[in-house]
Regions:
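Short, well-ordered beta-strand segments in beta-rich or mixed alpha/beta enzyme
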Residues: 2-9, 38-70, 93-94, 107-109
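An amphipathic, aromatic/His-enriched active-site/gating alpha helix that lines ligand/cofactor pockets
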Residues: 20-37, 56-94
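Residue-level signal for secondary-structure boundary sites
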Residues: 16, 60-62, 101
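Short, surface-exposed ligand-recognition loops at beta-strand->loop->(often short) alpha-helix junctions
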Residues: 9-20
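Acidic/histidine-enriched, glycine/proline-rich intrinsically disordered or flexible terminal extensions
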Residues: 86, 90-91, 96-109
């Protein structure tokens, strides 16, 4: 299993547009085969950093997922929405593997 972390630099004046973009991916990404952890918009601290996080089985599975996402009607619409509104100023992808496993569940005090 590999996890893709997308770091976005967004236009701070278009946070609402990014949040709509994130909600759209919340529908399209799982439908196209990735395990979506979520999209995260600025809350405290930096007003221009946002993240998207999802996992796939392998890089081959990632390529298949990307093909399905490009063919998905909402996926295509969301790509165009971002291109048209230009709220994403920069986008970087990093692929990571879990190194801390196994680890226990959260322990509440």
């Amino acid at each position: 299993m590999i996890t893709c972390i997308i770091r976005y630099h967004i236009d701070l004046n278009q946070k609402a547009e990014f949040e709509q973009y994130a909600r759209n991916w919340g529908q399209a990404i799982p439908r196209c085969g990735a395990d979506l952890v979520g999209y995260f918009a600025p809350y405290e601290g930096s007003a221009t950093l946002a993240y998207g996080v999802y996992s796939v089985e392998s890089l081959a599975a990632y390529e298949q997922y990307r093909s399905r996402l490009a063919a998905d009607p909402l996926g295509r619409e969301n790509y165009e929405f971002a291109k048209r509104n230009r709220f994403v100023l920069r986008e970087d992808r990093t692929f990571l593997k879990l190194a801390s496993s196994p680890h226990p569940a959260l322990v509440s005090p």
